[in-house]
């Protein structure tokens, strides 16, 4: 979950 960008699944 990134902020400001496209939400990527953070592990």
UniProtKB/Swiss-Prot annotation:
Cellular localisation: Secreted
GO annotation, biological process: neuropeptide signaling pathway
The keyword Secreted belongs to this UniProt entry's keyword annotation: yes
Predominant location: secreted
GO CC term, one of those recorded: extracellular region
Coiled-coil residues: none
UniProt keyword list: Amidation, Neuropeptide, Secreted
In-chain residues carrying the UniProt-annotated modification Threonine amide: 11
InterPro entries: Periviscerokinin
Tissue distribution of the protein: Expressed in abdominal perisympathetic organs and abdominal ganglia.
Record family assignment: Belongs to the periviscerokinin family.
Protein function: Mediates visceral muscle contractile activity (myotropic activity).
Protein name: Periviscerokinin-3
